[in-house]
Amino acid sequence: MKIGTVTGSVWATRKASCLSGHTFLVVYTGTEELVASDQVGAGPGDRVLLVTGNTAARYCMDAPVDAVVVAIIDKQETREVY
């Protein structure tokens, strides 16, 4: 899983039938920008949780996607580890 911030949207009026109903977001993870299928209604500025790779395709019933937004992060805590 990866954490990222939604920076934009992608619109595609013509797409494969298996992607019908999907909306797409541009998500920046701090090291890369990804286009992800949005399953939770995230919007610009939202911090989100992503799944990528084979897990993403399985999550979307084998649609040809590499990344899926599966959660909007409300709060994140980090602790120092020694």
Residue ranges and their predicted role:
Residues M1-V27, T31:
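N-terminal first-folded block
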Residues V51-Y82:
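C-terminal structural segments of small proteins and small subunits
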Residues T5, L49-L50:
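Hydrophobic beta-strand signal
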Residues R14-K15, T23, D38, V69, ...:
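Solvent-exposed, flexible loop/coil residues
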Residues E32-S37:
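Short alpha-helix capping/helix-loop boundary micro-motifs
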